[in-house]
Amino acid sequence: MGALQGIRVLDLSRVLAGPWCGQILADLGAEVIKIERPRVGDDTRMWGPPWMPDQDGNMTRESGYFQCTNRNKYSVAVDITTPEGQALIYEIAKTADVVIENYKTGSLVKYGLDYASLSELNPNIVYCSITGFGQDGPRAEEPGYDFIIQGMSGLMSITGEPDDVAGGGAQKVGVAVVDIQTGLYSTIAIQAALIARSHTGRGQYIDMSLLDVQVAALANQGMNYLASGKAPQRMGNQHPSIVPYQTFKAKDKEFIIACGNDKQFKDLCIAIGYPELLKNEKFVRNQDRVKYRNELIPLLSEHFLQKTAKEWVDMIHALKVPVGVINSIEDALAEPQIVHRNLVVNIPHRLNENFQTIGSPIKLSDTPVEYHHAPPELGEHTAQILSRFKTAEELAALKEKGIIDGKIA
């Protein structure tokens, strides 16, 4: 039994931030009913290549993107732009605990699927809206995109090499980190609202914004600006407050050192056979190493060219100084620690019994995450869910009219 067993989620969201939230809730045991457009589905179904291979290695039309964020969900294909489709959503909403949606601000009002409308049907509902800029303010009605928010929030201003370095300039993060973080924050907010409901007896509205989330996630960098009045700048892989805490080039490739305190720096110097650095007062304390990083880093950089990355990593690791390699994703998923922690899981899939996905990182002792089913086919569960309040004949008629899609009989 999952931790959220008995919680029903009506998921009207698409693409990533909302579906990521829904998948976490589904992994934790909630029944997540994903509403999709008939014959089209979630936009990300067609965001390939890469496409998922079938049992014989042939490419299907199932995108890798969709597969990463929709496991454990029930796909119901309903045209919410029609009165008949809206009536179906109302029936689901009557028994739902949670609604997730990520339409533009106000877009669902015309369909009667906004919080005001659904909370009249079900006052206990927790309704989470995810938008680019929130429900109010001068940009509230604009659509939001992860890449745009990375730029607007200041994240890209501190990501990448400085302008005066070869290849310098603002960079986005390699995954849609704003969407992912918003999905995480939304999950936290939903669970908090469910607990609050157990005390108050009523649901509530949650207003989540991509921009709000990423500004909050600036964390120490945002606080550094508020404390100093100076905007942090791009420093490549260096840390603004800790030295050495960056990548270094060995004889063959780069590796990472992350000295978090003065003792670790002392041990580093011993490990790499460079104890004379400790005789320089500029390098003994971290605050001085930060001040004189332009003197220390060239010395270390030249020294590290003498051996391979593996040699340095083994030597430094022996003295328990934080050090690591830079893996490709292929190497990361084959990393023995990742294998031991079962981060790559097999889930039976209608097209490939050897379907693999990256699993949940949540490890619960009494109510562990379970993988009930692979990401669904479009409309795979339409009949299963809608038959709770519609007859087979009624469903067949709705499919004939194009109101619903999927397996009916």
Feature-to-residue mapping (PLM):
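N-terminal helix-loop segment corresponding to the beta1-alpha1 unit
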Residues: 1-189, 193-199, 377, 383-409
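Glycine-rich beta-alpha junction loops
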Residues: 39, 133-134, 210-215, 252, ...
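Conserved Rossmann-fold dehydrogenase catalytic segment
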Residues: 135, 165-176, 198-214, 233-240, ...
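Oxidoreductase and adenylate-handling cofactor-binding alpha/beta cores
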Residues: 161, 183-203, 216-227, 269-276
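Flexible glycine/proline-enriched surface loops and loop-helix/loop-strand junctions
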Residues: 168-178, 249-252, 367-370
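Aromatic-enriched alpha-helical interface/lid elements that frame and gate functional surfaces
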Residues: 243-319, 323, 395
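Flexible, small-/acidic-enriched active-site or ligand-binding loops
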Residues: 284, 352-401
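A glycine-rich dinucleotide-binding beta-alpha-beta segment and adjacent secondary-structure elements
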Residues: 318-372
